[in-house]
């Protein structure tokens, strides 16, 4: 006779309070007492309401039968009690084993819950890190795009600067050509002016010599013409004529009509008498022509003096123009050289600045790539840890599942926290001293 175990009974609950053998014996004796009470009650009722004399034998037989039944029930209950005792001992041992298993499972559950909580915290950290990594990847992408754009703009600016340099070189070559031509023309003008100056100097010397000669001749003429007096000259001529041999010879000649010169003597004498006046008129004409020549020479001298002054003024003007042109050419050449030097210096400075910016951007991109590589390594480690945690949680022997709260919504990324995260990652991934760091392939 076995002990029936119902759903929800005392044996169906695992982890209930410990119940000893007396607990079940108490119920057994209760049932036995109840049966005895019922028997006694039946006997009392039979004795009160039944026919004792008639039914004594039958009642006795029935009582014997009931006693036998009760005895058999007692034997069955005794056997059942022994079976129950055995089962109780077995159940106690099973209970102890189950309790031990429950304690082990509880410890495993606590350990798994702690691991799950740690995994949940790691999952939250991993989620936050994913946000940071997404922000870093986006910033790296933006930096790469900006670097490409800046490379394009730098190339375009460099090409434009090269074009400007070429244009400036062409303009400088043109200006140098123009300056060379201007310089050659100025040198040619200078040479022509010098030749003209030499010619002017020669002409001036010749004119000076001619002037000196004219002055000397004028002085001689003036020295000769100043003491000349017409009346005195005529008187002197007459006296000279009277004192000369010609009148005396004419007076000594006779008037022979038959002489070949007789008829001519009167005319000759008259001609000789008029000779002083004729000589005076000739001398006067000569003096007038001499005065005219002197006036003409004076006018020519004044004209030459004026031409000399004009030539000197022209020479001074040409020298001033030459100096002015030379100064302008030198100033323009200096200005062009200064402008060319300034443009070249500006182009070199802009080129150096652009090269420096490109190097800085390349270094920054290299740092971003290194950080991204480190974050990828950290992400791989976190992923492997999370997979291990999930596999551990998904294993059996999890009697109690404690639901965790929902993952908090991600907050907007703070730049300061992002920089702090980068610093922590770099510090965590920084190798110890003496160990070389392998260069990243990115």
Swiss-Prot record:
Biased composition (Basic and acidic residues): 319-328
GO CC annotations, alphabetized: caveola; cell surface; extracellular exosome; perinuclear region of cytoplasm
Region (Disordered) residue spans: 301-328, 394-418
Chain coiled-coil ranges: 57-77, 202-225, 280-387
Main location group: membrane
Expression induction: By phorbol myristate acetate (PMA) or VEGF in endothelial cell culture.
Topological domain ranges for the Cytoplasmic compartment: 1-27
Glycan-bearing residues: 83, 89, 113, 151
Membrane-traversing stretches: 28-48
Positions on the Extracellular side per record topology: 49-442
Subcellular location: Cell membrane; Membrane, Caveola; Cytoplasm, Perinuclear region
Tissue-specificity statement: Expressed in lung, kidney, heart, aorta, placenta, muscle, pituitary gland, adrenals, mammary gland, bladder, lymph node, bone marrow, trachea, digestive tract, liver and tumor-associated endothelium.
Listed GO biological process terms: developmental process; MAPK cascade; positive regulation of cellular extravasation; regulation of vascular permeability; tumor necrosis factor-mediated signaling pathway
Role this protein plays: Endothelial cell-specific membrane protein involved in the formation of the diaphragms that bridge endothelial fenestrae. It is also required for the formation of stomata of caveolae and transendothelial channels. Functions in microvascular permeability, endothelial fenestrae contributing to the passage of water and solutes and regulating transcellular versus paracellular flow in different organs. Plays a specific role in embryonic development.
Name of the protein: Plasmalemma vesicle-associated protein
Source species: Homo sapiens (Human)
Lineage of the species this protein comes from: Eukaryota, Metazoa, Chordata, Craniata, Vertebrata
């Amino acid at each position: 006779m076995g002990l029936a175990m119902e759903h929800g009974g005392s044996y169906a609950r695992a982890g209930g309070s410990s119940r000893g053998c007396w607990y079940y014996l108490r119920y057994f004796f209760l049932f036995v007492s109840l049966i005895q009470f019922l028997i006694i009650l039946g006997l009392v009722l039979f004795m009160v309401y039944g026919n004792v004399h008639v039914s004594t034998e039958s009642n006795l037989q029935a009582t014997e039968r009931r006693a036998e039944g009760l005895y058999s029930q007692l034997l069955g209950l005794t056997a059942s009690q022994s079976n129950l005792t055995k089962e109780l001992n077995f159940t106690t041992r099973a209970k102890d084993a189950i309790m031990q298993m429950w304690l082990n499972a509880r410890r495993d559950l606590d350990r798994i819950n702690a691991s799950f909580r740690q995994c949940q915290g790691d999952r939250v950290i991993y989620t936050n890190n994913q946000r940071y990594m997404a922000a870093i990847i986006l910033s790296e992408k933006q930096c790469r795009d900006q670097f490409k754009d800046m490379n394009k703009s730098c190339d375009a600016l460099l090409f434009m600067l090269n074009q400007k340099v070429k244009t400036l070189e062409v303009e400088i070559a043109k200006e140098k050509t123009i300056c060379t031509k201007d310089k050659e023309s100025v040198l040619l003008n200078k040479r022509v002016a010098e030749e003209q100056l030499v010619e002017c100097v020669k002409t001036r010397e010749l004119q000076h010599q001619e002037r000196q000669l004219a002055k000397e001749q004028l002085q001689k003429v003036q020295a000769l013409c100043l003491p000349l007096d017409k009346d005195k000259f005529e008187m002197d001529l007459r006296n000279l004529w009277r004192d000369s041999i010609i009148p005396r010879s004419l007076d000594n000649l006779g008037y022979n009509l038959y002489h070949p010169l007789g008829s001519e003597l009167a005319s000759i004498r008259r001609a000789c008498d008029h000779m002083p006046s004729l000589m005076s008129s000739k001398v006067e004409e000569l003096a007038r022509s001499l005065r005219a020549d002197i006036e003409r020479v004076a006018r020519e001298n004044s004209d030459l003096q004026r031409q000399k002054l004009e030539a000197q003024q022209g020479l001074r003007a040409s020298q001033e123009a030459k100096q002015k042109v030379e100064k302008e050419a030198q100033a323009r050449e200096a200005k062009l050289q200064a402008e060319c030097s300034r443009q070249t210096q500006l182009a070199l400075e802009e080129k150096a600045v652009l090269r420096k910016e490109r190097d800085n951007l390349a270094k920054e991109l290299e740092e971003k790539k290194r950080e991204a590589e480190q974050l990828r390594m950290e992400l791989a480690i976190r992923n492997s840890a999370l997979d291990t945690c999930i596999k551990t949680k998904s294993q059996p022997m999890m009697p109690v599942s404690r639901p965790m709260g929902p993952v908090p919504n991600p907050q907007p990324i703070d730049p300061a926290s992002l920089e702090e995260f980068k610093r922590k990652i770099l510090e965590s991934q920084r190798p110890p001293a003496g160990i070389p760091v392998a260069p990243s392939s990115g």
